[in-house]
């Protein structure tokens, strides 16, 4: 296996919103999708592999439209790198994975969080770190990393009762 030159092939993180980027803006408001936390999480983790952020959307995944998914697919396909992470809300992550499956010759890993990254007990840091590692070693295709597991994008579902992703 040939190791690519990191400087020539940085990892691109495309952000779409979702719980990973949610915040309370004041004590009276509901969660809202805020500025992406991906850059902060990678800096705190002292990630040295080259990466860059493409902030595409700031939406709850339940609010994503078919047009948003086409825009996501086109944005991911247009990246000059072979490795792309997509931060995404967990409720419709598998729907976006299906749309991204039409992209050939890229390793695409979707991840998100069940609790906002701004919360100390969030799974966001772990999930993003796992996606960052997975995107470097997996062959081209679409994957989802959640709950300490890597799933093929076409062989996973969110079990809302258990609050986790499961094969299927």
Model-derived regions, located:
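Active-site histidine-anchored catalytic micro-motif
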Residues: 2-168
């Amino acid at each position: 296996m040939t190791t690519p030159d990191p400087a020539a092939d940085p990892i691109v993180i495309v952000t779409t919103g979702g719980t990973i980027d949610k915040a309370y803006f004041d004590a009276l408001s509901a969660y809202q999708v805020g500025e992406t936390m991906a850059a902060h999480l990678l800096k705190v983790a002292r990630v040295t592999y080259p990466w860059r952020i493409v902030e595409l959307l700031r939406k709850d995944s339940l609010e994503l439209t078919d047009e948003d998914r086409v825009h996501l697919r086109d944005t991911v396909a247009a990246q000059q790198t072979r490795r792309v992470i997509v931060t995404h809300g967990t409720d419709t992550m598998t729907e976006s994975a299906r749309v991204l499956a039409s992209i050939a010759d890229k390793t695409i890993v979707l991840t998100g969080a069940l609790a906002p990254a701004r919360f100390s007990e969030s799974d966001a840091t772990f999930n993003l770190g796992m996606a960052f590692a997975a995107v470097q070693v997996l062959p081209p295709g679409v994957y989802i990393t959640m709950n300490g597991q890597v799933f093929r994008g076409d062989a996973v579902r969110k079990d809302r009762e258990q609050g986790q992703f499961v094969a299927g």
